[in-house]
C-alpha cells in the first residue's frame, strides 16, 4: 500500500469520528406508479427516535387546538376518518397520515425556516399548533382543493 493511503484512511476515520453533525429534520418523498397510484414515505431525522405509534381517528372524533399560551384554540370534529403516526398520548399531534378520501398530510421539522403567526386575542379561537395542522387537514378536507378553500379557517400559532 502506498504511504498516502494509510494517512488518508486515518484522516477519514478521525473526520467521521470527530465531526458531529446531528441530524434534526425530516425528508419526505412520493413515488407515482405508472397506473397513477402514489406511495408516500418520510424520514424522522432526530438524535433519538420519537415515541411514536399508529392511531386511527374515526369520523366524529373531537379535537381542540393548542395555543402557545396553553389556552384552547379551535374546536373541531373529524368529518373524515383518518389514520397516521402520532407522538402524543391523545393522538392529536399527527406526524403524518392519510384520510378515508386518500388525502395525505405530514408535518416536517424546519428549524430556522418555518414561521408561524403570533397568538393574538383575535386569532386564538381559530388557533392550533404547527404539529396539529396535519390533524386538522385530514379531519376536514377531502382533497387539496378543499385544503386551499378551508385553510383560512385556522391560524397556525407558534
Each predicted region: which residue ranges?
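A contiguous strand-loop segment
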Residues: 24-125
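Positively charged n-region of N-terminal signal peptides that target proteins for export
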Residues: 1-6
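Residue-level marker of positions within ordered structural domains that often coincide
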Residues: 13, 45, 152
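Bacterial N-terminal signal peptides
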Residues: 7-20
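Alpha/propeptide regions of enzymes that mature by internal proteolysis
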Residues: 32, 123-157
Amino acid at each position: 500500500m502506498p504511504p498516502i493511503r494509510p494517512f488518508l484512511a486515518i484522516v477519514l476515520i478521525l473526520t467521521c469520528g470527530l465531526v458531529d453533525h446531528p441530524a434534526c429534520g425530516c425528508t419526505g418523498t412520493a413515488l407515482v406508479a405508472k397506473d397513477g397510484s402514489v406511495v408516500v414515505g418520510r424520514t424522522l431525522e432526530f438524535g433519538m427516535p420519537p415515541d411514536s405509534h399508529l392511531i386511527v381517528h374515526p369520523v366524529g372524533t373531537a379535537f381542540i387546538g393548542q395555543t402557545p399560551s396553553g389556552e384552547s384554540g379551535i374546536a373541531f370534529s373529524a368529518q373524515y376518518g383518518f389514520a397516521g403516526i402520532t407522538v402524543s398520548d391523545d393522538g392529536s399531534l399527527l406526524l403524518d397520515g392519510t384520510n378515508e378520501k386518500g388525502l395525505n398530510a405530514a408535518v416536517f421539522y424546519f428549524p430556522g425556516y418555518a414561521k408561524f403567526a403570533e397568538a393574538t386575542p383575535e386569532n386564538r379561537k381559530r388557533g392550533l399548533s404547527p404539529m396539529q395542522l396535519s390533524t386538522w387537514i385530514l379531519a376536514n378536507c377531502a382533497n387539496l382543493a378543499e385544503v386551499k378553500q378551508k385553510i383560512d379557517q385556522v391560524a397556525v400559532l407558534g
